[in-house]
Amino acid sequence: MQENNRYRLKPHEIVVLKKMRETEARNVLVIGDLHEPFCLDGYLEWCLEQYETFNCTQTIFIGDIIDNHYSSYHETSADGMGGADELELAIRKISKWYNAFDEIGTKVIIGNHDRIIMRKAQTSAIPSKWIKSYKEVLG
Protein backbone atom coordinates (compact mmCIF):
# COMPACT_ATOMS: atom_id res chain seq x y z
CA MET A 1 0.00 0.00 0.00
CA GLN A 2 1.36 3.39 -1.01
CA GLU A 3 1.84 6.03 1.67
CA ASN A 4 -0.52 9.01 1.48
CA ASN A 5 1.42 11.85 -0.14
CA ARG A 6 -0.92 14.78 0.26
CA TYR A 7 1.93 17.25 -0.33
CA ARG A 8 2.72 15.69 -3.73
CA LEU A 9 6.36 15.28 -2.82
CA LYS A 10 8.78 13.28 -4.89
CA PRO A 11 9.96 10.05 -3.23
CA HIS A 12 13.44 11.42 -2.49
CA GLU A 13 11.88 14.55 -0.93
CA ILE A 14 9.82 12.37 1.42
CA VAL A 15 13.01 10.56 2.52
CA VAL A 16 14.77 13.88 3.21
CA LEU A 17 11.78 15.21 5.14
CA LYS A 18 11.55 12.08 7.30
CA LYS A 19 15.28 12.19 8.08
CA MET A 20 15.00 15.84 9.12
CA ARG A 21 12.13 15.00 11.45
CA GLU A 22 14.15 12.19 13.07
CA THR A 23 17.13 14.37 13.94
CA GLU A 24 17.37 16.81 16.82
CA ALA A 25 15.42 20.05 16.80
CA ARG A 26 16.44 22.83 14.48
CA ASN A 27 14.45 25.66 15.95
CA VAL A 28 15.53 29.17 15.07
CA LEU A 29 15.08 32.14 17.37
CA VAL A 30 14.43 35.25 15.27
CA ILE A 31 15.17 38.53 17.04
CA GLY A 32 14.11 41.77 15.46
CA ASP A 33 14.77 45.45 15.85
CA LEU A 34 16.89 45.90 18.96
CA HIS A 35 17.37 49.60 18.21
CA GLU A 36 20.18 49.76 20.77
CA PRO A 37 20.82 51.68 22.94
CA PHE A 38 17.04 52.13 23.24
CA CYS A 39 16.03 48.46 23.44
CA LEU A 40 13.15 47.56 25.74
CA ASP A 41 14.34 46.63 29.23
CA GLY A 42 14.03 42.88 29.75
CA TYR A 43 13.99 42.00 26.03
CA LEU A 44 17.34 40.18 26.23
CA GLU A 45 16.17 38.06 29.15
CA TRP A 46 12.87 37.32 27.38
CA CYS A 47 14.72 36.24 24.22
CA LEU A 48 17.00 33.96 26.24
CA GLU A 49 13.93 32.42 27.87
CA GLN A 50 12.36 31.77 24.45
CA TYR A 51 15.61 30.24 23.21
CA GLU A 52 15.52 27.71 26.05
CA THR A 53 11.75 27.14 26.01
CA PHE A 54 11.70 26.26 22.32
CA ASN A 55 15.02 24.36 22.30
CA CYS A 56 16.54 26.68 19.69
CA THR A 57 19.75 25.79 17.94
CA GLN A 58 20.28 28.98 15.97
CA THR A 59 19.67 32.71 16.36
CA ILE A 60 19.05 35.26 13.62
CA PHE A 61 18.96 38.99 14.28
CA ILE A 62 16.86 40.51 11.49
CA GLY A 63 18.17 44.05 11.41
CA ASP A 64 18.07 47.41 13.15
CA ILE A 65 20.59 46.33 15.76
CA ILE A 66 21.55 49.98 16.33
CA ASP A 67 19.01 52.81 16.30
CA ASN A 68 21.32 55.59 15.03
CA HIS A 69 18.63 58.10 15.98
CA TYR A 70 21.04 61.03 15.81
CA SER A 71 21.70 60.40 12.11
CA SER A 72 18.14 59.89 10.87
CA TYR A 73 16.90 61.51 7.68
CA HIS A 74 13.82 62.40 9.74
CA GLU A 75 13.85 65.13 12.34
CA THR A 76 15.65 64.11 15.51
CA SER A 77 15.05 65.20 19.07
CA ALA A 78 17.02 68.24 20.15
CA ASP A 79 17.20 66.61 23.59
CA GLY A 80 18.48 63.29 22.22
CA MET A 81 21.96 61.83 22.54
CA GLY A 82 24.76 62.91 20.27
CA GLY A 83 26.32 60.45 17.86
CA ALA A 84 29.33 59.48 19.97
CA ASP A 85 27.28 58.95 23.14
CA GLU A 86 24.61 56.90 21.36
CA LEU A 87 27.19 54.72 19.61
CA GLU A 88 29.24 54.06 22.76
CA LEU A 89 26.14 53.10 24.75
CA ALA A 90 24.88 50.95 21.87
CA ILE A 91 28.22 49.11 21.70
CA ARG A 92 28.09 48.37 25.44
CA LYS A 93 24.53 47.07 25.18
CA ILE A 94 25.15 45.04 22.02
CA SER A 95 28.05 43.30 23.76
CA LYS A 96 25.52 41.78 26.19
CA TRP A 97 23.58 40.34 23.25
CA TYR A 98 26.80 39.10 21.68
CA ASN A 99 27.83 37.33 24.88
CA ALA A 100 24.35 35.81 25.30
CA PHE A 101 24.08 34.50 21.73
CA ASP A 102 27.72 33.92 20.79
CA GLU A 103 27.30 30.48 19.30
CA ILE A 104 28.06 28.93 15.97
CA GLY A 105 25.23 29.65 13.61
CA THR A 106 24.20 33.08 14.89
CA LYS A 107 23.46 35.35 11.94
CA VAL A 108 22.98 39.10 11.80
CA ILE A 109 21.11 40.82 8.99
CA ILE A 110 21.84 44.51 8.55
CA GLY A 111 18.74 46.72 8.68
CA ASN A 112 17.93 50.19 7.41
CA HIS A 113 18.87 51.81 10.75
CA ASP A 114 22.20 49.96 10.66
CA ARG A 115 22.84 51.15 7.09
CA ILE A 116 22.05 54.82 7.71
CA ILE A 117 25.69 55.82 8.20
CA MET A 118 26.65 54.38 4.80
CA ARG A 119 23.58 55.99 3.25
CA LYS A 120 24.54 59.37 4.73
CA ALA A 121 28.08 58.91 3.43
CA GLN A 122 26.70 58.17 -0.05
CA THR A 123 24.43 61.23 0.14
CA SER A 124 27.52 63.30 0.99
CA ALA A 125 29.57 61.65 -1.80
CA ILE A 126 32.07 60.19 0.69
CA PRO A 127 33.91 57.24 -0.90
CA SER A 128 33.24 53.90 0.79
CA LYS A 129 36.99 53.53 1.42
CA TRP A 130 36.56 56.09 4.23
CA ILE A 131 33.84 54.02 5.94
CA LYS A 132 34.71 51.38 8.55
CA SER A 133 33.15 47.93 8.58
CA TYR A 134 30.59 47.01 11.24
CA LYS A 135 33.15 44.68 12.80
CA GLU A 136 35.70 47.50 13.07
CA VAL A 137 33.19 49.80 14.75
CA LEU A 138 31.45 47.29 17.02
CA GLY A 139 34.53 45.27 17.94
Identify the function of each model-found stretch.
Residues 31-139:
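Core catalytic region of metal-dependent phosphoesterases/phosphodiesterases
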